[in-house]
Amino acid sequence: MTPEHVTERKALVLLKFGSSAWNRWRDENPDIMIALDGVNLDGMILTGVNFAHVSLRNASLHATNLMNADLRSADFTGANLTEADLIAANLEGAILRGATLREADLLGANLTSAQYAEEDLRGALHAPVPRRTAL
């Protein structure tokens, strides 16, 4: 049996109803795989949204409010998160390779085990300071 996938169109309709409607649908459909690769979510208010394990490769989330969002293991490869509000977002295990986070606010965000290079966070507000080993 192959896992079900949600269509991009259905996902976007659900998101227009807000985070609560989206999260309720996710709770009712935990086995459905979600790929929102290349979608435009610019400026949307998605506070507290559950995007855990969602593929958002090359998506545009410019100035999107993702405060307190569950973004665990989400794939943001090549995504545009410029000026995104990621305050207190859970990005544990998220893939941020090649993502643009210029002026994104990461205050209190959990980046434990997130996959990124220093340049991916360049220009982000409240970005974690990379740890350097002493010589």
Task: Name each region found by the language model.
Residues 2-11:
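Eukaryotic low-complexity, mixed-charge intrinsically disordered interaction/regulatory segments enriched
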Residues 10-13, 17, 21-135:
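Tandem repeat scaffolds
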